[in-house]
Amino acid sequence: MDQLLDVETLKKLSPEQQEQVISGVKQQAALANAQNLVTDISEKCTNKCITAPGSSLASGEKQCLQRCMDRFMESWNLVSQTLQKRLQEEMASSGGMGGGFGQGPSFS
């Protein structure tokens, strides 16, 4: 399902087709999320740690980059887990309806 579907069209799909659309959207979102993460880490850690660009990294720059990436990943994981938990709580409190598409998978 490469084309964009509006809500009315999605409602007309079978539950299996809805799950397929949702799965595709989740995969695209995960890929975009990973690309954004790599871009953010590269920009932030490079700007912070590499003070004198050259043909190789100094040992202090390597250590700084490693610590920066580790902290960034830890923070990103914490934020992701917190967001996922909140989405799951919202889904549970709203009766578990997946955005009006029935009992299919959620976007959490």
From Swiss-Prot:
Protein name as catalogued: Mitochondrial import inner membrane translocase subunit tim-13
Gene name per UniProt: tin-13
Keywords: Chaperone, Disulfide bond, Membrane, Metal-binding, Mitochondrion, Mitochondrion inner membrane, Protein transport, Translocation, Transport, Zinc
Localisation: Mitochondrion inner membrane
Bilayer topology term: Peripheral membrane protein
Residue segments, region Disordered: 89-108
InterPro entries to which the protein is assigned, alphabetical: Tim10-like, Tim10-like_dom_sf
SUPFAM superfamilies hit by this protein: Tim10-like
Naturally occurring in which organism (per UniProt): Caenorhabditis elegans
Keyword Transport: yes
BP term (GO), one: protein insertion into mitochondrial inner membrane
Biased composition (Gly residues): 95-108
UniProt motif (Twin CX3C motif) ranges: 45-68
Species lineage: Eukaryota, Metazoa, Ecdysozoa, Nematoda, Chromadorea
Membership in a protein family: Belongs to the small Tim family.
The organism's place on the tree of life at top rank: Eukaryota
Domain notes: The twin CX3C motif contains 4 conserved Cys residues that form 2 disulfide bonds in the mitochondrial intermembrane space. However, during the transit of tin-13/tim-13 from cytoplasm into mitochondrion, the Cys residues probably coordinate zinc, thereby preventing folding and allowing its transfer across mitochondrial outer membrane.
GO cellular component terms attached to this protein's record: mitochondrial inner membrane; mitochondrial intermembrane space protein transporter complex
Function text: Mitochondrial intermembrane chaperone that participates in the import and insertion of some multi-pass transmembrane proteins into the mitochondrial inner membrane. Also required for the transfer of beta-barrel precursors from the TOM complex to the sorting and assembly machinery (SAM complex) of the outer membrane. Acts as a chaperone-like protein that protects the hydrophobic precursors from aggregation and guide them through the mitochondrial intermembrane space.
